[in-house]
C-alpha cells in the first residue's frame, strides 16, 4: 500500500513538472506564432529573466508540494501503517489468547470427564462393598437367629423331656404306692401295670 501511494505521488509530481515546463515554454514563446528549430535558442535567451523566474517558481512549487503534501501524506501513511500493524498484532494476540482459552477449556473438560468417571467408579465400588457388607451382616444375623432358635428348641425339648421324665417317675411312684396299698393279686397287678404303661404312651403321643 505504501509503495502504491509513493508511485502515485511521484507520477503526479512528474505530470505537474511536465505541465509547468510546458506552460513555461508557452510563456517564453507567446509572441512567436511559429517556432523553428534554428530560432529556439534565440527566442529563449532574450527571455532569460522570465525563464529564471519560472524556474524559481517551479522550485518553490516543488518544495511547497514536498512540505505541504508529501510529508503529511508520508506521515499519514506511516501512522496508518502503524495502526494497521497494531490492529494485526492485537488480532494475533487475541487469536492466541482465544486458542489458549480453548485449550484450557478442552483440558478442563477432559479433566472433568476423568474426575466424573473416577467418582462414578468409586461410587460403584463403594456400593458393591456396602452390598457385600449388608449381605454378610444379614447372613450373620440369619445364622445367629437360626442358631438361637435351635438352641431354644433344644432347650425346650430338654425341658419337655425332663418334665415328661419327672411326671413319669411321679406316676410310677404313685402307681407303686397304690399297688402297695391295694395288695392285689398278680393278674390285677399285671393289668394295672399294662394300663399304666398305656397311659404313659398316650401321654407321650399327646406331647
Curated annotation (Swiss-Prot):
What NCBIfam families does this protein map onto? ATP_synt_b, PRK06231.1-3
Q: Which GO terms describe its cellular component?
A: plasma membrane; proton-transporting ATP synthase complex
Q: Is the Transmembrane helix keyword given for this protein?
A: yes
S-diacylglycerol cysteine-type lipidated residues: 28
Q: Which organism is it from?
A: Mycoplasma pneumoniae (strain ATCC 29342 / M129 / Subtype 1)
The record's section on Pfam families has: ATP-synt_B
Signal peptide residue numbers: 1-27
The Gene Ontology terms for molecular function here are: proton-transporting ATP synthase activity, rotational mechanism; proton-transporting ATPase activity, rotational mechanism
How would you summarize the oligomeric state and partners of this protein? F-type ATPases have 2 components, F(1) - the catalytic core - and F(0) - the membrane proton channel. F(1) has five subunits: alpha(3), beta(3), gamma(1), delta(1), epsilon(1). F(0) has three main subunits: a(1), b(2) and c(10-14). The alpha and beta chains form an alternating ring which encloses part of the gamma chain. F(1) is attached to F(0) by a central stalk formed by the gamma and epsilon chains, while a peripheral stalk is formed by the delta and b chains.
Name its cellular compartments.
Cell membrane
Question: PROSITE patterns, alphabetically?
Answer: PROKAR_LIPOPROTEIN
Looking at the UniProt entry, the stretches that span the membrane are 49-69
Q: Name the job this protein performs.
A: F(1)F(0) ATP synthase produces ATP from ADP in the presence of a proton or sodium gradient. F-type ATPases consist of two structural domains, F(1) containing the extramembraneous catalytic core and F(0) containing the membrane proton channel, linked together by a central stalk and a peripheral stalk. During catalysis, ATP synthesis in the catalytic domain of F(1) is coupled via a rotary mechanism of the central stalk subunits to proton translocation.
Principal location listed in the UniProt entry: membrane
Lipidation sites, kind N-palmitoyl cysteine, are 28
How does the entry describe its membrane topology? Answer: Single-pass membrane protein
Which keywords are on file for this protein?
A: ATP synthesis, Cell membrane, CF(0), Hydrogen ion transport, Ion transport, Lipoprotein, Membrane, Palmitate, Signal, Transmembrane, Transmembrane helix, Transport
Decide whether keyword Signal is in the record.
Answer: yes
Member of which family? Answer: Belongs to the ATPase B chain family.
Protein's name in the database: ATP synthase subunit b
